[in-house]
Swiss-Prot record:
Name of the encoding gene: tropD
Residues the record marks as carrying a glycan: 146, 346
UniProt-recorded name of the protein: Cytochrome P450 monooxygenase tropD
Enzyme nomenclature, EC number: 1.-.-.-
Organism classification: Eukaryota, Fungi, Dikarya, Ascomycota, Pezizomycotina
Location(s), subcellular: Membrane
Amino acid sequence: MAYGSQLTLLSGGQSIIILLIVSFLAWRFRVWFRLRHIPGPLGASLTNFVRMSWVFTKKAHLIHQELHQKYGDVVRFGPNMVSISDPASIHIIYPMRKGLVKNDFYVPLRPYTRNRGAIPNVFTALDEDLHMKLKYPVASLFSLSNVSKFEVLVDEVLSVIDEQLDRRFASHGEIFDLTEWLQFFAFDVMGTMTFSKRYGFLEEGKDVGGMLNAIGQFMKQAAPVMQNPWLDRVLYKNRIADSLKRTPGSDIMKFVVAAINERQKSASEDEDFTKARKGKNDFLDEYIITQKKDSNIPPWFVTAWTISNVLAGSDSVGTVMKTTMYNLLTNPRTLEKLHAELVAANVSRPRPRWSEVHNLPYLDAVVQEALRVHPPFALPFERIVPEGGLHISGQYIPANTVIGASPYVVNRHKPTYGDDAELWRPERWLEGGPEVRKKRDDGLLTFGAGRRICLGKHIGIFEVKKLIPFLVLNYDISIVKPETFLAENEWFFRQSNLLAQIRRRPLESVEPNV
């Protein structure tokens, strides 16, 4: 009798296991079946771990591009994920109206705190109402007219990099990694704009306090699990994981919170805080003032706004600067052409004025081409297809499918940017009539598109248009070993090893040494 009962219980346990397995397989088949008409690699249609493995190679952008070349404009990247490559679909996936909301892909980009969990910001907020609450109070601070008020602060940092390049490298022809110094510049500008102080990256010629490394490690950790966001919660964003090993985001949060606490202390001790700093306000001042003026804005919004400046405000801009200089130096014809335009426009030396460089046609084309060939972000910007589904490039995408487009892939779409879309050629932005130019402009996905377009777009362009003319006018720069230049995709493009030599250009010099 006991033996029979044991057999019955065992059979019951086995039945439950079998039922669970069958249910899981049925669910997976249903997920696979609903997108069976979308072409793509078989393995990717079965599990998200395939596209996660692409990210681990640090060449996901190239894999994505090859898949679109093989399968077309609509490719299945995951069991429930579809990638689009045609710029004509941008307005459908990323409209100005409400419709396609963000998914958990963005959650790994939120720094974790034990008290508040993973803090969302303007970019990583999934809920549209929360996004607008975060964005609306500070959006005007990022307008081009307001950003240009920071020119005097950027000029201070330009003076520092000018002095350091002269003293360390130009005077004796030492070979150095230009990418490091461009990143130092971008971070010190971010520090000046956000906190009214530089952090000494340029003066010391190194990653002060390991902040750049912390940001890099944070992105390196986040990128793979963005393909499987549930892993982020299991591995990193919980109290147990955080107590065993602090995440790189913890160091970034510590840096930001310390800066905020210091400034808020000054604000609480000075009733006329806003008046005392009027005319000298940095972003952090404006964030604190904005929050204090509106009781409906919670204090943690200040942290969310500030962390956005630190995470995206230096790395993304640094990527554009590195891309621009690498391509100018490896394509000397374009460097000559840019230099000639700057000289003809009588741009000031050593520090160009924004009023002199903001509307130069060839400089504009150079910056646009840099944004096109190597956008700072190089994974698809994911959204959720709404009820009713979508028709894109002749394919029906059912509701609740995750859909997205990679800036790297879209920006190299040959029907839009020409058969030479793989090449650096700034002139493409100056060619064609109004309709052709508008098509190219509208197809550029570097800053995103629609209602969730990057808030810091104008800051990035402002910094790049200040720095690149400064370097081109004041220095003869020669690349030493172009083959050592390395670009790796860790959500942000990581660029390194742009080995160069520089010498000071005489004031009367008008020809670049190329």
